[in-house]
Each structure stands twice: as C-alpha cells, then as structure tokens.
Amino acid sequence: MEVGSATKKLQCQRIGCNAMFTDDDNPQGSCQFHASGPFFHDGMKEWSCCKQRSHDFSLFLEIPGCKTGKHTTEKPVLAKSVPKHPVAAPTSSPDANAATKDSCSRCRQGFFCSDHGSQPKEQIKQTLNTPGQAEEEKIEPLAPPVQKAVIDINQPQVCKNKGCGQTFKERDNHETACSHHPGPAVFHDRLRGWKCCDVHVKEFDEFMEIPPCTKGWHSSSPDPAV
C-alpha cells in the first residue's frame, strides 16, 4: 500500500517553530511562531514582533512564539531590521561647565547635580569598598550539586545542543547521533556565525541554515556541564 503525501513528515519553516507535521494533522493553532525576525544590537537579541529579549543566544531561541497558526513549509520573508543608532547628548566645553558649576547653588554646596555631573566627595568615599569588604563579598556558600533527573529511556526529549533541536529517545542516543555546533554563536558588525567552524553570514535565515560541524550525543540539558 502506497503511503500518501498527506502522511509524509514535513518540517515547519516558521520562525521559532521547526516542528515536524503532516498535511492531514495540521489544525489551526498547532504552530506557535514569531511573526517577524530578530534584531541584534550591542549584544542584545530581541524579537521585533513581541519585544522579548535576551543576552544569551540559547535562551533567546527558547523564547516561545507570540502568534499561533498552521504549520507551513514556506519560508517567511523577513524584513531587514535597521539598527537604531543612539544620538549622542550634546556636551559643553570644560570652561563653560566650570563657569556654570560656580554659579550653581547645589554645586557650590557640594550636593549632587545632574545638570553639571558633580558629586560630593563624601558620597564618593562611601561607594568605595575597602579590600576587606571586597573579599567578604566574594565569599559565597557552596551550592549543593545539581541532581540529574531520572528520565525514561523511551521518553521523547528535545536536544538542547546548539544547531540540533531534534526530538530523540535515550535508548537511541549514541556518540554520533547529534549534529551540532559546540562553540557559541557570534554576532559582530552585522554578521552572524559560529565560533567553532568560523562561518559567518549576514542574514538570520542563512545563519540558522549553517550546517552543524560536530557529531556527538544528544543532550536534553541546555548546559553541557549538567
């Protein structure tokens, strides 16, 4: 008996989903996705559709989608985000600033003044920590070791290795089961890439399609050390 195309497993191409589905099992609301692409600026990663953000790339990819609909194999067309350049505040010359500070009653009395950036010396001294205080702040109690959760070998899990995201069972896991990126993602000068394989592209969808460079075990923990 020939299996129809309706039962063929397909991968959803919506941003933030990537789930496997079939044409005969694709109800409205089964797909949770991001309606528009990401925005990267000053080390911050943000979804432009819902303004959810994170500094950590792995946590950023785990932010759930803000819209629901049907799965699709059509890749979304992403609008290129234009970074917002901060406008520098006007600065006054040192001579002019000194003149205004002399005429300002708050500055002359030693109070903090946001207009002229002065700060009383006593307040500065209080913010400085002595060497003994700094050492005390560094001493923290040791946290108890994290206990690994006991998982059924037949229980489906989602691999958290970067670049993988596949569903697996522990009974089928082995040393070459997972294709992933061991190194961190790198975002610099509007380029996106992986440090482990030194591949960099400009567009986010091209970045997500960079093939993994390493084989290994699937891991359901976002932290390889756990």
Swiss-Prot record:
A GO molecular function term, named singly, is: Hsp90 protein binding
Binding-site residues, Zn(2+) 1: C12, C17, C31, H71
Function according to Swiss-Prot or TrEMBL: Required specifically for plant innate immunity. Is essential for resistance conferred by multiple R genes recognizing different bacterial and oomycete pathogen isolates like avirulent P.syringae or H.parasitica (downy mildew). Contributes additively with SGT1B to RPP5-dependent resistance. Functions as a positive regulator of RPS5 accumulation by assisting its stabilization. May function as co-chaperone of HSP90-2 to positively regulate the steady-state accumulation of RPM1 and protect it from SGT1-mediated degradation.
Keyword Repeat listed:
yes
- How does the entry describe the domains? The 2 cysteine and histidine-rich (CHORD) domains bind each 2 zinc ions, and the plant-specific 20 amino acid cysteine and histidine-containing motif (CCCH motif), located between the two CHORDs, binds 1 zinc ion.
Q: Where does Zn(2+) 4 bind?
A: H181, C196, C197, C213
User: What PROSITE patterns does the record point to?
Assistant: CHORD (PS51401)
Q: What happens when the gene is disrupted?
A: No visible phenotype under normal growth condition. In case of infection, plants loose R gene resistance mediated by RPP4, RPP5, RPS2, RPS4, RPS5 and RPM1.
Q: Where does Zn(2+) 3 bind?
A: C159, C164, C178, H218
Ranges for domain CHORD: 12-71, 159-218
The organism of origin for this protein: Arabidopsis thaliana (Mouse-ear cress)
Q: Which UniProt keywords apply?
A: Immunity, Innate immunity, Metal-binding, Plant defense, Repeat, Zinc
Highest taxon listed in the record's lineage:
Eukaryota
Q: Which Pfam families match?
A: CHORD
State the span of motif (CCCH).
104-124
Record's protein name: Cysteine and histidine-rich domain-containing protein RAR1
